[in-house]
Amino acid sequence: MAKGFTQQSSVDFVDTYSPVAKFASNRIIMSVVATMDLELHQLDVETTFLNGELKEDIFMLQPKGFEIKGLEDEVYKLKSSLYGLKQSFRQWYLKFHWAILEIGFEMNPLDHCVYIWRCYDELKILSLYVDDILLAGNSLDMMIKTKSFLASRFEMKEMGPATCVRI
């Protein structure tokens, strides 16, 4: 874990953002799921913060217990974001955002963590809550394709159909 509390704004990072779908958005999605009898599945992104790409140069001491003998005082330049950095959430979100747009989803202009995909009579709605994803749709085949795409980009844990959603 990085020591984000030692970071200085405009020196070590510029932007921060936590990708959390709005409470009202998730309630609307649940209403649409119930009204249209959509499938609702849950996914969890593993090692979320390692997916973000850093724009800044960040250096880190070796974590205690993982020091290399003879090189205990060395510092290392991070290649990707890490849990604890102030910009990690934003960097993860940007990586996810561009990936999901690539397969035709459109970002909801009122909630940047809700994405919609429509094609003729097929519909998919995706809600992002940091590293947790709710995916609703009326075509199981299209949902499977979306999950396969996400799994090809990110290490995913398939949680299956959502049985209990706390909103």
Regions found by a protein language model. Name each.
Residues 1-167:
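Long, low-complexity, charge-biased intrinsically disordered regions
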